[in-house]
Amino acid sequence: MIVRNDTLWMAQEAFTSGQAYDRAHWAAYTRHDYAVFNPVHTWIEYINRLLGALLGFPVLLATGWTLVRSKSHPKWALTMVAALLVLGFEAWLGKVVVDGNLIPHQITYHMAGAFALLGLLTAVYRSVSSEWELHALRAEREVEGLEADRRAAYPLFMGLIALLSVQIILGTQVREEVDALVKAFGLYADRSDWVAQLPVGLLVHRSFSLLILALSYYLYRKTAGLGGLKVRAAFVLYALLAETALGAAMYYFAIPRILQPVHLLLSAVSWFLLVDGAFKAWLMLRKG
């Protein structure tokens, strides 16, 4: 493979090259257009793969530990085995996405897998930590309406998880459209008219956030007096408020590049808090 005129060319067959370039021996390489070396992209991809590899070690160790304790805690073992399989799938799909130069739809699948992995690991974390909280949950004082609020909190957390899952998929599809514009016009192109070129899914994504915010505020009010759930509901509300504010900033200020990863990070934080809160609410119902 060679670079000529800022374009990658691939040899069509084995041959001995001479001093002069013979176009007949070469075909344009179309899988991606990284003919010009970009150190920023290279470092981001390197760190991404390094972190993915480092994540595999604790997941593998945790899976082994839960398998040893599978007789006493079979659900831990099953959940960690599922997490290990999802992690392996994510590693493979991540390579496919990169090799295919950000293939549309596969980014959405990759993102969905990442959030599924986060949900599984959060469930195990909450289940393990609940062993330490068991006595505190049993000692919690019963007050008027507390049991009813406990029962209401769990479906609210689950409902928000379902809505946020849909919102994340919608957002990932919007991101794919932005990637297409980046590919067409360049990373550093003027983005002032990009929002107008995005499909109607952006408007659905924007409006859907208001429903999620309203439900998260209702959850916050409903968990009053429930200790740890109140704190988690508050963090969920604050994270979703910040995420929505960043989304609005991207909409009205021409999709600043720096805001895109922060917006995604906040969605992951919100997802973690919701799964953690839902699992804790379920444990409170079971053990309270």
For the regions a language model picked out, list residue spans one by one.
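Interfacial helix-loop-helix junctions of multi-pass membrane proteins
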Residues: F37, G88-M111, V174-K183, T244-A268
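Hydrophobic cores of alpha-helical transmembrane segments in multi-pass inner/ER membrane proteins
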Residues: L55-L60, A114-W132, S209-Y218, S267-W282
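Membrane-interfacial loop-to-transmembrane alpha-helix junctions, especially the N-terminal start
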Residues: H73-A83, A153-F157, L226-A239
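Membrane-interfacial, low-structure loops and terminal tails that flank and connect transmembrane helices
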Residues: S130-Y154, L285-G288
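Membrane-interfacial catalytic/cofactor-binding modules of polytopic membrane enzymes
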Residues: Q167-I212, Y217-R221
